[in-house]
Amino acid sequence: MDIEIGFHEENWAQVEAAWTAWWAGELERPLVMVEDLERLPGVSMGSIYEMGAPVCSFPLDTPADQLLDYYQVRLEARRSYGDAWPKWWPNLGPGIMAGFLSADLHTAEDTVWFEPVEQMPIQDLQPAFDAENAWWQRTLEVTRLAVERWGDQVSVAHTDLGGNLDILASLLTTERLLFDLHDHPEEVARLAGRLTQLWLRYYDELYCLVELAGRGTTPWAAIWSPARCYMLQSDFAYMISPRMFERFVLPDIATCCAALDHAFYHLDGKGQIPHLDMLLSLERLRGIQWI
């Protein structure tokens, strides 16, 4: 289906050339991304809904084509200049992988969060891939249909899978995970490693869909790659020591970096600065987003 976004093959060629050169360290200027959004009826400028409410805020029985109609209006109201490009991010909330693993998903006007379905000892927690999980099926459906509908006109992003301890906090609660780091560190290490392996599976299955458009990859953040990229993160790491970061988070980041061509890290808050030297030691981590 054609989409009127004012972005043509020559624009794509320029974006791909600039970003490819930037990753190679050969671009002799900074990347500059400019986006212009036309005013939409009933949507204030600067609203979180400029690009639409999260996918997860709609009932699960809402037809996917109807959802994409809603997002297409917003895509067609946006223009990309410089090194920016047309993208659509299937937003199901930060760390939706917790939802894939059966955490309860809650939405409010301006946020999404997760809670465990039931409280259980950390020793009993056994996260496993569930191909029939409703949120996983929804993510696959909207990603696949977006690629089929917009083809090579729009870069369809990976959803925000989350970081291993962020996901674990959603399955246990943040408070319980903080206690378990002290009381049951071996169990935390077991689950952190298991979640990393599940993360890689979810990433790969989504990559098999988005690569069909032939427009590289992009995560929830404004980075583009001709190959496999992602904005890795561990917001939970703000609350833990460098020693704990080295044991429970760094192996996850290193493993994910090894599976990606262009990995970035989302350094969210000054509480993560104590971990910076360890992050910089990862040869395959290509950059850090300083928030």
Model-flagged regions — what are they?
Residues 1-44, 52, 57, 70, ...:
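Active-site loop segments of alpha/beta catalytic cores
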Residues 87-123:
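A contiguous, low-structure linker/loop signature
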